[in-house]
Amino acid sequence: MKKLNVGLIGAGWMGKTHSFCYKAQRQIFGPDPFVPILHTICESNDNLAIKVQKEFGFENYSSNWKDLVKNPEIDIIDINTPNYLHYEIAKLAIEEGKHIYCEKPLTNSYKTALELANLAEQKGIKTLVGFNYIQNPAHFLARNIIDED
């Protein structure tokens, strides 16, 4: 099994959710072709970074996302920051040859999202935008209620 070092940016609610999922991956899905290694958690709040590092077993923590993205040991950048920061982080990650998992939305505009998609394709980078709630029954109910009017 291939080990992939994950650098996770943003230790808030969604960052913690992603951390939990990385830890639970094998129990839920069984043996996979790769094993995610929680390498570094990055958070501007050092106290929160240290707390999440200990809680989920990250090897390191950082408060500088640019240093994390440029770290040659990192294979995947997992972006869980406020939406307006996604573009800058994702663009640098692609330029640095890192694969990306980004919470929705990828960017705040179609134009910049298309730019990142094209750049990732040119560089052979795998990307994924997380729409974690797209299949949530509450969303189907809301859609049905809206459609009834």
PLM features: residue spans?
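Beta-strand-loop-alpha-helix segment that lines the small-molecule cofactor/substrate pocket
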Residues: 76, 82-134
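Short, conserved SAM-binding/catalytic segment
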Residues: 51-58, 115, 119-120
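Oxidoreductase and adenylate-handling cofactor-binding alpha/beta cores
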Residues: 135-149
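Local beta-strand N-terminus motif with an aromatic residue
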Residues: 38, 58, 74-77
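Conserved G/P- and acidic residue-centered "switch" motifs that form tight phosphate/ATP-binding loops
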Residues: 10, 104, 149
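N-terminal Rossmann-like dinucleotide-binding module
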Residues: 1-56
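Conserved SAM-binding strand-loop segment of SAM-dependent methyltransferases
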Residues: 59-64
